[in-house]
């Protein structure tokens, strides 16, 4: 078999090999009923609200939807389109499975176009798709980044084929598509396009006006999303920008690039990726000048971007694994090493992808089993109830934490119940809680508590329970609270419990007839 240049196709460049890599990329997500990513239950709760609340009077009386051109709608839009066929939970699972599939396809296409053929080292980049941001449940961002990689790979292809109308249209319209998936996905796409423009037009250290003009004109193709951004980010929707130059955190996010469950395994995996890039930078491996420039642009952006960027938290954490992936794609074995050495490297890359995929599959299966145990309480929650959930995360927080802080949202999806677990992000979410729920208990920010003796910033469980507006809720759901720390108030009637979770009915005090009559005399 030969490639487009008439050269022999090696086994790591075959369709069968690429197909195997794509299967390995989706394998961890196949078993769990819903993807066990930290924020996903809250996202699914929002999807359930957005797809129609006609049959859920409690939800329709509390939530409102404010449609606006938010740069945070990728998975939302796809689930909205698919839910009539399969329901919200299966639609969410299907869309999230597509994220690593599209990401891997995009990364492999970038590597193939940059090197002229798929290098033996390319597969080393794929495990970075299952990165900390993905495990955290930043699914709209992850979809935006996947689209950015795929469209950038197509841009490189049509630039090689000398089809300027096609690649310019891809940048122009692709920018808008990626923006609506997630605004930071558009930023990632911009970094890729800017780095590529520098490679194409900056040909020497002596910068000319023609070079600057060519780079600027190519980058202006990215500007179409500025129209909805101006509409969206006007008024009170600008968001916070803070924590510049947290240098120690920068290295921490690189070490945490694949953070999930096993600190040594994931830390060493990240260091392997750094080491591979280092081999290219010092010249031991061949490095694509095009992708090296893209990597340097992303690295510069990573160093300067703050933790919070116009309301987007963990901004630098999201960029770290994507930057590493591009750095790995830039490297390749030197031709002088021969086919045997390249084949050995390809086998090592395949082994790395397989090991990472198997480990993530095991991790996700364990999270899914754990979630099933936490959610045994759901049948005891009356349909349409108003539930205040209080979650006590582990203390102290470690590398691996149980993904429980957003599990209360499963009561929205499976019991049509209100739960205080939607995100409070003005201008970044379409769903808002109405005035019937006091704001101090309306959103996810009200749900986390700490137990006595725990040195965390959340309020004490007992203090938070005392503040519950009893008239606004029917039930209290405690997660992560052991029996010794559970309340014994007379207005809380136990309904269900196990060693980790408890549900109480809130007993409202009846006004006595004497009190209704008022004072005498």
What are these regions (language model features)?
Residues 32-43, 54-56, 63, 71-72, ...:
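Transmembrane catalytic cores of multi-pass membrane glycosyltransferases
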Residues 45-52, 63-88:
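Short hydrophobic/aromatic helix or loop-helix immediately within or flanking a transmembrane segment
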Residues 94-114:
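Transmembrane-helix motifs of polytopic, lipid-linked glycan transferases
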Residues 107-129:
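Transmembrane-helix signature of polytopic, membrane-embedded enzymes
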Residues 136-143:
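Short acidic/glycine- and proline-prone juxtamembrane loop motifs at membrane-interface regions
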Residues 310-338:
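Hydrophobic/aromatic-rich transmembrane helices and adjacent perimembrane loops
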Residues 329, 333-358:
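Signature aromatic-anchored transmembrane alpha helix within multi-pass, membrane-resident enzymes
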Residues 367, 377-459, 468-481:
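Short periplasmic/luminal acceptor-recognition loop of GT-C membrane glycosyltransferases, typified by
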């Amino acid at each position: 078999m030969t490639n487009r240049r008439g050269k022999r196709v090696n086994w790591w460049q075959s369709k069968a090999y690429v197909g195997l890599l794509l299967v390995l990329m989706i394998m961890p997500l196949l078993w769990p009923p819903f993807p066990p990513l930290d924020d996903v239950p809250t996202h699914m709760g929002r999807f359930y609200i957005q797809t129609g609340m006609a049959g859920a009077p409690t939800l329709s009386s509390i939530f409102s939807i404010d449609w606006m051109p938010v740069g945070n709608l990728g998975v939302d839009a796809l689930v909205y389109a698919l839910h009539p066929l399969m329901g919200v939970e299966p639609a969410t699972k299907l869309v999230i499975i597509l994220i690593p599939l599209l990401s891997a396809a995009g990364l492999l296409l970038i590597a193939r176009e940059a090197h002229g053929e798929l290098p033996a080292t390319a597969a080393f980049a794929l495990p970075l798709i299952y990165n900390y941001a993905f495990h955290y449940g930043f699914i709209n961002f992850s979809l935006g980044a996947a689209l950015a990689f795929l469209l950038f790979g197509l841009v490189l292809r049509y630039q090689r084929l000398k089809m300027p109308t096609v690649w310019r249209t891809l940048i122009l319209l692709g920018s808008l598509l990626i923006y609506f998936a997630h605004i930071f996905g558009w930023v990632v796409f911009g970094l890729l396009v800017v780095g590529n423009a520098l490679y194409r037009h900056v040909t020497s250290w002596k910068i000319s006006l023609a070079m600057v003009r060519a780079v600027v004109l190519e980058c202006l193709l990215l500007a179409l999303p500025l129209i909805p951004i101006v509409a969206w980010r006007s008024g009170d929707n600008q968001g916070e920008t803070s924590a510049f130059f947290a240098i120690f955190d920068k290295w921490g996010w690189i070490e945490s690039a694949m953070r999930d469950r096993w600190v040594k395994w994931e830390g060493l995996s990240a260091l392997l990726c750094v080491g591979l890039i280092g081999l290219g930078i010092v010249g031991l491996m061949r490095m694509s000048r095009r992708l090296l420039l893209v990597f340097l642009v992303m690295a510069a952006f990573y160093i300067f971007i703050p933790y919070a960027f116009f309301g987007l938290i963990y901004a630098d954490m999201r960029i770290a694994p994507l930057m590493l992936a591009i750095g790995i794609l830039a490297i390749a074995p030197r031709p002088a090493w021969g086919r045997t050495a390249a084949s050995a490297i390809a086998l090592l890359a395949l082994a790395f992808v397989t090991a990472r995929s198997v480990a993530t599959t095991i991790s996700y299966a364990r999270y899914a089993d754990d979630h099933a145990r936490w959610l045994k309480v759901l049948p005891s929650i009356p349909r349409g109830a108003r539930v205040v959930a209080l979650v006590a995360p582990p203390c102290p927080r470690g590398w691996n934490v149980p993904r429980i802080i957003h599990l209360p949202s499963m009561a929205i999806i499976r019991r049509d119940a209100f739960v205080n677990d939607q995100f409070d992000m003005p201008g970044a979410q379409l769903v808002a809680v109405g005035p019937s729920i006091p704001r101090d208990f309306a959103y996810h920010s009200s749900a986390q508590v700490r137990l006595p003796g725990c040195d965390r910033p959340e309020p004490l469980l007992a203090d938070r329970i005392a503040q519950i507006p009893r008239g606004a809720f029917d039930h209290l759901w405690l997660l992560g609270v052991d029996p010794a720390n559970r309340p014994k108030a007379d207005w809380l009637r136990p309904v269900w419990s196990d060693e980790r979770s408890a549900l109480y009915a809130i007993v409202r005090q009846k006004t006595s007839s004497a009190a209704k009559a008022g004072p005498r005399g």
